[in-house]
From Swiss-Prot:
Family in the record: Belongs to the glycosyl hydrolase 16 family.
Disulfide topology: none
Protein name: Beta-1,3-glucan-binding protein
Subcellular location(s) per record: Secreted
Amino acid sequence: MSFDLTTPFDVIKTVSLSARYSWTTSQKGATLNITYNDKNFVLSSSLQLSTRASNITFQATTPFEGFQNSFIEIKYDIDNREELLASRVSVDDHSYSFVVGGYIEDKLAVFKWNLNSPLTGWTDAKFVAKIDLSSENKNLEISLEKEGDLKAIAVSGKFIGSTLDFNLRTPFRGLNNFNVFGSLNRSKRSLEMRMMNDAGQASLAGNFNSLRFNMKTPFERAEQISWEVTKTGEGSYKAEWRRNDNYATFTIEKDVSKQSFDLNIKSEFRGWEILALTGRLDQETKQAYLSGAINEQKITVTGSGSITNKIKFSMTIETPYENYRQVKAQLNYAKRKNAIKLEASSSSSDFHLLWSRSGSGLEAHLIVPNSRQNTEISINLTPTQGKITITSRFEPIRDYLQEYHVNLGQNEITADHIIKLNGHEVFKMDFERNAPEQKVHLEIHTHVAERHTTIHFHREGFSKLNFLFKREVPQYGEKHFKVDITGSGALPQKGALDIVVENTFREPAKTINARVEVDRTGARKKIMLEVSPRQSRVYIFNLEYIADLESPQHGDFTLKITTPNNSPWQNISGNWNVEDPNDATITFTVGNVTYNAKGKLTLRESTMILSSTDPSAENIYLQWKFERNGDTKDYFLKLGRKSRYGMLKLTGTITDIAHVDIEGGFKAGPFMPNEFLFTSMWGKSNGVVTGEGTFDYGNYHGSHRLVKFERNAERKSASFEWSATSNIPQYNSVSVSGNYDFNHKVVIFVVINADGRESKIDINIADINPTSSRNTAMISIPLLGPTFKRTELTVSHDFSHPNRKSISAVAKFGRSESFINAKWNRSDGFDTLEGNIEAKSRFLGDFLINVRYDMSNIADAHAEVDYLRTTTDGDKKEFKLNWTRKSTDDHLENEMVFDSNFETLSHARAYANADYGGIFKLLSGLDWDDKKISLTLEVRKNKISGILTTPFEGFETLEIDLQYKLTGKDKSVKATYQRGDRKASFNMEMSTKGKKGGSFKVDLTTPFEVVKNLHIDGQYENKVAQINYQRNDIQMNFNGKANIKSSKASFDISFTPPSGQNIRIAASYDVQDFIDGTGDEEKELASLSLEFEGNSMDFSLHGFRNDDRLYVMIHGTSSFAVLKMFHLKLDSELNTEARDGTFELTFNDFKFNVSNHFERRANNGYYFRSKIESTLTPLPALIIGLGREGQERIITIGYGEDKEITFSVKGKNNFLSGFSGKVDIPSIGYEGVEYDVDYSFPGDNHLQIKVEIDLNENGQEVEATFFLDSEGIKARLSSAVLGDHSLRVRRSVAPDGFYAEAGLDDYNLKLRGGFKNEDTARGVQLEGEVFGKRFLIDTLFQSEGKRYSEGKLIIHTPFHGMEKMGGLFTWSNQNKKIMAHAELHLPSYTTPTITGEISLDLKKKINGYVTLDVAGEEFTLKCNLAGSSISQGYTGSLEFYTTIPCCITCCGDR
């Protein structure tokens, strides 16, 4: 079959079609060829069908790019085990295949599939499952191979008789090899079970006489745990428990003849090395005995008693504690009298306990002995009086007294209450009430710190009322609020009230005077109110009104107002007549303007419009309608002036929440110049809600369409699609679509399109897992500008490995991306760690931090820190910091190296190496950039030598050599000093002759002009010396008094020449203990001092050395400007458990100091802290610290004095359930701050977080909680400093309503809706709240015929003058008893609320009342009339009451 078409048109020049097919029983095929201009399409298909094998193929050739050659094949062959089912698809160069094979035989089954595709990760995937039940061992094997990665699970086992053997092999850590074995021997009545995995094993064995459990784990604290229970006799047992080296044994033996038990316990725990208990109980005599010992401290308890109608029990407790050597206790309980008494006392102290309760009250007494002062508490409480006293040694409550008295007389009631703390009265209350005299008096005083508060209330009938609230604070003085009311005349019928109100809390203080005059004696009631808020400002209100008692549906009133500024509404009058609800009239006059209204006025409907005689005055609408007939509703409300009215209407059919057809509108008073009108219709079919509608607002109009809303309540998910068109600029076409899923996740996807501008919200928190997760949230809103129009946040973590962890957070803002990644790997004991932090920020740039350290061996420890930052300008900032420490018995090395690309400091190195064998050698120094300072020091038995190199001009190299011989009678010191080509030498000799005489000689040569040559020699005898002195060309000979001191290791010579300036030569040398390493405290090892003619030079070497510490300090000063001071200090503890190290170097004004601290802590922990400061840089000291204590990790970082932060963290359950720790910030006064964070997963889709922070300052605490589930988020923060704060984001949908909320503290965005659809009641409630401003629309109508009806339409808004509008009513008529209540709320300040209430009994009488409340002014008509009808007449009384002091009573017959 073929078809050809040729035309002259370019669009369709040629069209040809040809088709052929073959149709046989075994094979069917068809081919279709289409030619369109120069494009050719070929489609072919074949089909082979049979009961055991079939094959379907389809092939297409098209000119479309990407689909030029397509092939599809689907086949099955139940006789082909390798390809039971096969599907192959190829599109151009892309091929997909899926092949399923397998077979089932007796006790053998195999299933497998292969998948090939061009998709990444699935190019080649194979799955094989095999079950073999043919042998005694049953086997199950499952394997999955993807991209060459093979994961296999093998299960094998056997179950023969009463024996089970199960084996499992998996690729999962902890379950690589898993075995379970169980055996049950019924004849021996025994059971044995065993379970093993890669890291541990557990076994359980038991029979009727014993039960044994044994477990081995890889954990250090529970390497081996076992317990065993054995029955040793009738009623006798032995139990033993062990954990590593800790154990406990329990034995209990029963004496059948005496019905008693003996109990023995022995154990060994850390802290309780020996614990033993022995006990006995005799059930017949009600006697008990218990003896125990902890670390040889024995405690014994014995007791006996009787149980009848009364319970008596006595007990004696003997303890090793001083104040409780022997304690005797007695318990008595009388059930009939409901009385109980417990009393205990000690023979060795004042300890006493009494607790007694009976019908008359409660009595308690407690004395807790203490060497400083006992603590004593006494309590006596009855209904009419009570007293509580406490005395203690604690400052906050050294003396406490609370006492009360109550007197309940027939006509008079009095009460008083007082509380005193530490001798100061903090609370006092007096109350008195006298009913016959109509007197009430209340006085309350409170004292808190220096604040005194007084509350006073006093009333005497209608003649006097006083109220006072006063507060006295020394800082602010006295402030009070006071009201004084004085009455006169025959109140409440006729009289006056004078009112004075004072308020000094406000600034300035304010006094208000008011007078109220009432006359209720005449037919026309009069009320006059005069108010003076301040001097010369008087407001007067005169009200006269009358209402016909026989026809209360009509009446009139007159109100005259006098104000200081003569307002136009000084005179107000009016009348009303609502006898005929369908033709009601209301008239009232304000000033010269009269308003009239006429129309229908009922609770269900009103057509009233208030119009004025003044053409310029606006009409006022008082219109409403509330009608309902089945599913049809007609609600309308229109209130307010013509230019500012509010409107709400809703008409249509509401079958249920899923089937609605309505039209409505609303206008929010003056805030909306036009009415917003709308129509809406939606319905539900097959679980999908669809709808449409229109809207109009002024010149704007449009339509909308709900394409679908499909919700799955069980899975807590839904999808929706909505669109709208309008003539609003930039919003001609708007569409919203998306879905949400809260089933074990938080997934929200919303797309909003407005005239081609697309906004998107994509939140995917589906991976809530404590060990690993990856969650994303994306928001795309073009209105936010190019920077934030698209925001995407991804947070992930991996804590699945016990030692290797990572955290990642990525944030994308528009085209920029910021992230932070942290990874670390550490040892089990945290002795070693490698980690890095990588981050990118649009504000800080890119930075990378690498940290590595090894503290496993403090004798060979090192740490490295690498820092690299690229700023937003492209500049790179980087540095490396390395620290090493090595030590042996006779050698110590410390080195710290700093390298950076900083211009101020590119390189720095500080080091100190020491050898302390027979000769002590020290090599230390400091390098920075191209400058170096080094010191080589050698200490021998009689010699000290050193070389100092510096970068300072003139001091490039300094060499010093000191030789001492200070033993014997002849002493000498030789010193040489060389700085460049400048040399100085010093020789001193001293000879002693006996104890009182001797000679000395000193020679000094220097390159300094002031002392190129110095020679001193002399002889002394009995502290008198003859001296020869020569300095350069100055020569002197003199006699004088000499002060000479000499010992085995030192000498000190000083004398005063005629010039008066002292000359002193001193030297000391004692280094043997230092070389031997036997010192234990700092001492002077060597010194040399020289003073002459006001010049001085001092040198000293201090130190000591032993196996635990090396301390060396060199200190030199001179009066010469070139070398004022040199200081070097090395202090290093060699103890590997705890050590402090210090390195200090000072050369004139140059300083460099390093302080290190290291200590071992409990549970194989440690802490290391280093502080570095130098004049090389203006930066303050740098402080770095890290450590571990058990599971707690500690980090310190800071700069300068007290400008450091120490932070520690301790994981809970390997950080799976939370963490805790401490924080020290001394710079702001917070030390020892403790925090605790708990997070848990109560359900699959619940996350709960709780944070507690103890500021360790006057008990201040901070608490915060966070809860996430499928309905939203709740969070709370409580702090004495920050206050209480809360955050809420919730939503809930139910068949009868919905709720949504987003809130922070008192600021809320809320929307709540409810639907009531019952047989007799229908209603709708919509509630909204925006930042504390509440909106509410509440409607309800319920009818049960003439017996009962109720209805309401209430509108709450935050708008001024329209806070509450609408009304409500209830009506009931049962057995001729009528109860009715109605309220009307108007948008008016003069008449905001009108309330009416009726309660009548019409059963052969008219008994009840009718109440009308207009703006707080209440009118009540009470009647009590007896009779059967109006024609026969009624007998009784009518009374009329108002809130104005008046009453009218009419009695008689009618």
